[in-house]
């Protein structure tokens, strides 16, 4: 059975505090990441928390990109889910680079193939 989608869960550590706390920067980064991967952006929604942190989603024709940032820990939780021929790692890597992550761990899960099959996690210290 062919996969219906690819879901990358990305754990980003050692990120820049100011970038993780800047909603406009994160929104632009996520839209650019989607476009760089070849996706078609449909909707964008982000929220800035007090005293810090940003959560948001970019809905793409091919699925979505999400973030929950924790600037006080230098940490961001990222999800990139794509359908079709798009590679979610393109967007995930773009985001990690933009946030200046020191360490990233990506787990890719093929979606729509029956029982969940988690591919080997890939961790990079940058």
Curated annotation (Swiss-Prot):
Could you list this entry's UniProt keywords, alphabetically sorted: Autocatalytic cleavage, Decarboxylase, Lyase, Polyamine biosynthesis, Pyruvate, S-adenosyl-L-methionine, Schiff base, Spermidine biosynthesis, Zymogen
User: Site (Cleavage (non-hydrolytic)): which residue positions?
Assistant: 62-63
Record flagged with keyword Lyase: yes
Q: Pathway it belongs to?
A: Amine and polyamine biosynthesis; S-adenosylmethioninamine biosynthesis; S-adenosylmethioninamine from S-adenosyl-L-methionine: step 1/1
GO molecular function annotations of the record: adenosylmethionine decarboxylase activity
- Locate the active site: 63, 68, 83
Quote the cofactor binding remark: Binds 1 pyruvoyl group covalently per subunit.
UniProt PTM comment: Is synthesized initially as an inactive proenzyme. Formation of the active enzyme involves a self-maturation process in which the active site pyruvoyl group is generated from an internal serine residue via an autocatalytic post-translational modification. Two non-identical subunits are generated from the proenzyme in this reaction, and the pyruvate is formed at the N-terminus of the alpha chain, which is derived from the carboxyl end of the proenzyme.
Catalysed reaction equations from the record: S-adenosyl-L-methionine + H(+) = S-adenosyl 3-(methylsulfanyl)propylamine + CO2
Q: Which GO terms describe its biological process?
A: spermidine biosynthetic process
Q: Which cofactor does it need?
A: pyruvate
- Which residues are recorded with the post-translational modification Pyruvic acid (Ser)? 63
EC number in record? 4.1.1.50
**To which protein family does this belong?**
Belongs to the prokaryotic AdoMetDC family. Type 1 subfamily.
Subunit info here reads: Heterotetramer of two alpha and two beta chains arranged as a dimer of alpha/beta heterodimers.
Q: What does this protein do?
A: Catalyzes the decarboxylation of S-adenosylmethionine to S-adenosylmethioninamine (dcAdoMet), the propylamine donor required for the synthesis of the polyamines spermine and spermidine from the diamine putrescine.
Can you name this protein? S-adenosylmethionine decarboxylase proenzyme
List the top taxonomic levels of the source: Bacteria, Bacillati, Bacillota, Bacilli, Bacillales
């Amino acid at each position: 059975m062919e996969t219906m989608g690819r879901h990358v869960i990305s754990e980003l550590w050692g990120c820049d505090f100011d970038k993780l706390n800047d909603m406009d920067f994160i929104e632009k980064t996520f839209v650019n990441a989607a476009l760089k991967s070849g996706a078609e952006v449909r909707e964008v929604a982000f929220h800035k928390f007090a005293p810090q942190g940003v959560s948001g989603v970019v809905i793409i024709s091919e699925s979505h990109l999400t973030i929950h940032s924790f600037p006080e820990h230098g940490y961001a939780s990222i999800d990139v889910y794509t359908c079709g021929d798009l590679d979610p790692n393109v967007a995930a890597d773009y985001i990690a680079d933009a946030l200046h992550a020191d360490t990233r761990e990506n787990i890719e899960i093929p979606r729509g193939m029956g029982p969940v099959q988690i591919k080997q996690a890939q961790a990079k210290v940058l």
